[in-house]
C-alpha cells in the first residue's frame, strides 16, 4: 500500500463503524464473557458485585437437578442464557436478552427486576479484553 492509498483509506475511516464491526465479529466470545464467565462461573454482575444468593427453595430445586447452587448463575433451563444478544449503536453497545413470555411473565424483565440491570454487560477486566480485540482488529484493518 502506498502512502497515498493509506491516507485515502484513513480519511474514509469511521471509528464507530470499525468498533461495531469488531463487536459483531466477536459477538459470541463477548456474550460468553457475560453469561458464562461472569454470571455462571463467578456469579457477578458487570460491576463485579456478587449477585444475591438464591432463595432456599431454589437451592433445593437446583440440588435436585444437579445444577450449580454455590452462587447465583441465572441459569436454570438455559433459555435466558441462550437468548443473550448484543445491540450495537453508533456510540455504544448494549448487552440484553430476549425471552419469550411464559406464564404471564417475561423472564428477562423478571431477572432484571430481581438482580438489577447490571447482570448485562462486561466487568472492567472484560472491557479491557474487548478494547484489546477492537484495537487489534482496527490495526489490522488500517
What would you call each of these model-derived segments?
Residues 1-142:
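Short, Lys/Arg-rich flexible segments
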Amino acid at each position: 500500500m502506498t502512502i497515498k492509498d493509506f491516507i485515502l483509506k484513513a480519511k474514509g475511516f469511521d471509528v464507530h463503524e470499525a468498533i461495531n464491526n469488531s463487536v459483531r465479529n466477536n459477538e459470541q466470545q463477548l456474550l460468553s464473557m457475560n453469561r458464562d464467565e461472569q454470571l455462571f462461573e463467578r456469579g457477578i454482575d458487570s460491576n463485579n458485585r456478587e449477585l444475591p444468593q438464591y432463595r432456599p427453595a431454589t437451592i433445593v430445586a437446583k440440588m435436585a437437578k444437579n445444577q450449580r447452587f454455590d452462587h447465583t448463575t441465572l441459569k436454570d433451563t438455559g433459555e435466558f442464557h441462550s437468548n443473550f444478544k448484543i445491540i450495537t449503536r453508533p456510540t455504544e453497545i448494549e448487552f440484553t436478552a430476549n425471552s419469550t413470555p411464559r406464564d404471564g411473565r417475561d423472564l428477562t424483565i423478571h431477572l432484571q427486576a430481581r438482580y438489577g440491570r447490571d447482570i448485562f454487560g462486561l466487568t472492567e477486566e472484560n472491557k479491557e479484553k474487548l478494547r484489546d480485540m477492537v484495537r487489534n482488529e482496527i490495526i489490522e484493518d488500517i
